[in-house]
């Protein structure tokens, strides 16, 4: 009896490990579930509970935890989890990059440019827009979307069968993040560029004025003013537009000759 229970526990642990490998990257990437919000043992327990909740098989169907057959399955599940984490984190990375661009242009991250080793890692505007995107995402059913994507991924890529996530398209992910962030930041960047031109002309007529010192204050005020006008009507809709839905997941599993573009 005790020997049977011992082997049964091994199967349960194997199912939890496979589920953890797919769900954990999503928790690591999403800003409202990462280590800044959940940390340590509580987060691991929640990951396992979520993984077992969406697990598509009986808990005793997984191979034994210490068997060689577990190695390729864990690697496959981890690859699928990284892909899902990147797709679900897409709007948050765009908003984070948007905040970094704005803060860089207004001079808030000047210390990082002068001394990268001791400068700040993340600007305040980037953190704010990242959390703002998380609020918009959660308010519009983001957790339901996350669970739908997980369920759909198990339908398309069964953990007990061989499947290959299409990881090469993720290599263009940084380009697409930068592209969307630059498009969203362009109104603010354009106004800040014009303000620098006017300050440069003013310094020509008033050489005794320190245009650089004044520009930091002026550009910060202008950036905040433009964001007040630009924030509400544009950014929430773009967070929802960039949010990944379960209906688009089928194209992210490997097919020869297929192309993948995030819009």
Swiss-Prot record:
Any Pfam family hit: Bac_export_1
- Presence of the UniProt keyword Cell membrane in the record: yes
Function, as annotated, reads: Involved in a secretory pathway responsible for the surface presentation of determinants needed for the entry of Salmonella species into mammalian cells.
Cellular component, GO annotation: plasma membrane
Q: Which GO terms describe its biological process?
A: protein targeting
Membrane-related topology note: Multi-pass membrane protein
UniProt entry keywords in alphabetical sequence: Cell membrane, Membrane, Transmembrane, Transmembrane helix, Virulence
Return the protein name.
Surface presentation of antigens protein SpaR
Please name the NCBIfam families in this protein's record.
Answer: fliR_like_III
Q: Which gene encodes it?
A: spaR
TM stretches of this protein: 12-32, 46-66, 82-102, 127-147, 182-202, 211-231
Q: Which family does it belong to?
A: Belongs to the FliR/MopE/SpaR family.
Q: What is its main location?
A: membrane
Q: Cellular location of this protein?
A: Cell membrane
PANTHER family registered for this protein in UniProt: FLAGELLAR BIOSYNTHETIC PROTEIN FLIR, SURFACE PRESENTATION OF ANTIGENS PROTEIN SPAR
């Amino acid at each position: 009896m005790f020997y049977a229970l011992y082997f049964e526990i091994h199967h349960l642990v194997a199912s939890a490990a496979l589920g953890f490998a797919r769900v954990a990257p999503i928790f690591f990437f999403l800003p409202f579930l990462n280590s800044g919000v959940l940390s340590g043992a509580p987060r691991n327990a929640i990951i396992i509970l979520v993984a077992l909740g969406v697990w598509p098989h009986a808990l005793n169907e997984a191979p034994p935890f210490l068997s060689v057959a577990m190695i390729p399955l864990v690697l496959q599940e981890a690859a699928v989890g990284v892909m899902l984490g990147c797709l679900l984190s897409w709007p948050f990375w765009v908003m984070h990059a948007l905040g970094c661009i704005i803060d860089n242009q207004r001079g808030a991250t000047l210390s990082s440019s002068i001394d990268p080793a001791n400068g700040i890692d993340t600007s305040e505007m980037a953190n704010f827009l990242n959390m703002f995107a998380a609020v918009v995402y959660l308010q519009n059913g983001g957790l339901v979307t996350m669970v739908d994507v997980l369920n759909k991924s198990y339908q398309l890529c069964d953990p007990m069968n061989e499947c290959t996530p299409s990881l090469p398209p993720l290599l263009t992910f940084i380009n697409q993040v930068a592209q969307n962030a630059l498009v969203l930041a362009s109104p603010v960047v354009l106004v800040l560029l014009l303000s620098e031109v006017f300050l440069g002309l003013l310094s020509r007529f008033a050489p005794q004025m320190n245009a650089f010192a004044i520009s930091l204050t002026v550009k910060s005020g202008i950036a905040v003013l433009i964001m007040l006008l630009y924030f509400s009507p544009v950014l929430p809709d773009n967070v929802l537009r960039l949010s990944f839905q379960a209906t688009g997941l089928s194209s992210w599993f490997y097919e020869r000759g297929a192309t993948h573009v995030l819009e």
